């Protein structure tokens, strides 16, 4: 369920804040969201894969913590990231 190098680079290019940005909260949330989406599709087909389900819940928790950090630092960055990724209504 991991991302290969080209997919990571595409996510970084679309969500980076400046030219050399590879680890900002926006990029991390985008990568986690992509991994969460892939793992969710996997779990729809493999219902009894409980270890992957546990990993999914950990990723969701990590993304939630990153989003709350972004919200505390900059409401505008948070809103832009949510809108770009389409993860909350």
From Swiss-Prot:
InterPro entries the UniProt entry points to: Ribosomal_uS15 (IPR000589), Ribosomal_uS15_bac-type (IPR005290), uS15_NS1_RNA-bd_sf (IPR009068)
| A GO CC term attached to the entry | cytosolic small ribosomal subunit
Q: Where is the composition biased (Polar residues)?
A: 8-25
Key word Cytoplasm present? no
Asked whether the keyword rRNA-binding is assigned, the reply is yes
Example GO molecular function: structural constituent of ribosome
In this chain, the stretch annotated as Disordered covers: 1-25
Question: What are the protein's UniProt keywords?
Answer: Ribonucleoprotein, Ribosomal protein, RNA-binding, rRNA-binding
Instruction: Give the signal peptide range.
Output: none
This protein's superkingdom? Bacteria
Record note on quaternary structure: Part of the 30S ribosomal subunit. Forms a bridge to the 50S subunit in the 70S ribosome, contacting the 23S rRNA.
Q: Which PANTHER family match?
A: RIBOSOMAL PROTEIN S15, BACTERIAL AND ORGANELLAR, SMALL RIBOSOMAL SUBUNIT PROTEIN US15M
For this chain, the family text in UniProt reads:
Belongs to the universal ribosomal protein uS15 family.
Read off the HAMAP family from this record: Ribosomal_uS15_B (MF_01343_B)
**UniProt-recorded name of the protein:** Small ribosomal subunit protein uS15
Q: Which gene is annotated as encoding this protein in its UniProt record?
A: rpsO
């Amino acid at each position: 369920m991991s991302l290969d190098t080209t997919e990571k680079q595409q996510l970084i290019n679309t969500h980076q804040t400046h030219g050399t940005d590879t680890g900002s909260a926006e990029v991390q949330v985008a990568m986690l969201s992509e991994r969460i989406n892939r793992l969710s599709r996997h779990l729809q087909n493999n219902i009894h894969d409980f270890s992957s389900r546990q990993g999914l819940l950990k990723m969701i928790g990590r993304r939630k913590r990153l989003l709350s950090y972004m919200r505390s630092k900059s409401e505008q960055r948070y809103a832009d990231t949510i809108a770009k990724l389409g993860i909350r209504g």
